[in-house]
């Protein structure tokens, strides 16, 4: 196969499409070969598993999210530049999630318990390993919830005009809050920025 590829390059000088495709396949192969080692959490010390909550047998969804947070740290350690995490809401079959049109208190109480310990442990772990100063952690959503109950339900409708996201690491100043909503928490009224600005900030950092 290598000889055929070399012959193609010789017969078609300047044609970089094949070389680019070969390089992409080789990169994909190397990535796949590294997955078993990266995803093997058996080498993690017991105190790390406890810190993240990965050993929480009473809350398997939380334990699963905790393992994903540990995996995220391991990926960052190996130079992966973008890692995305979900908090495990749909591991419950989608009934209990952040889309709180109904059962809002039940849903949010449960999912706050799922993400709180693992997320905090991830940030602390990155910091203790000297990785946080070069890693931007972003916690965000596509919209918030209205400050009043949805008609006929025990929940709240979508609110695209006022919600919270946070960042840490990568030189972010601690304790800084930017933007203010009105007195009801309904809409941003000061230092209002479109999502384009948010995305630009992430890319800049």
Task: Show where each model-derived region lies.
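Ligand-binding pockets and gating/stacking loops
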Residues: 1-205
């Amino acid at each position: 196969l290598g000889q055929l590829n070399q012959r193609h390059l010789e017969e078609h000088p300047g044609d970089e499409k094949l070389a680019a495709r070969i390089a992409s396949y080789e990169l994909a192969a190397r990535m796949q070969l590294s997955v078993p080692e990266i995803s093997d959490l058996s080498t993690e010390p017991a105190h790390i598993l406890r810190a993240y909550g990965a050993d929480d047998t009473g809350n398997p969804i939380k334990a699963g999210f905790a393992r994903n947070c540990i995996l995220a740290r391991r990926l960052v350690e190996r130079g992966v530049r973008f890692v995305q995490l979900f908090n495990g809401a749909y591991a419950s079959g989608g009934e209990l999630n952040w889309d709180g049109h109904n059962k809002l208190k039940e849903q949010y109480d449960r999912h706050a318990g799922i993400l709180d310990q693992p997320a905090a442990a991830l940030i602390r772990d990155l910091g203790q390993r000297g990785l946080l100063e070069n890693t931007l952690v972003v916690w965000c959503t596509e919209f918030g919830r209205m400050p009043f109950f949805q008609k006929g339900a025990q929940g709240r409708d979508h609110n695209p005009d006022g919600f919270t996201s946070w960042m840490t690491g990568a030189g972010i100043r601690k304790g800084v809050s930017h933007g203010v909503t009105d007195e009801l928490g309904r809409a941003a009224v000061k230092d209002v920025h479109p999502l384009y600005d948010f995305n630009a900030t992430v890319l800049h950092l």
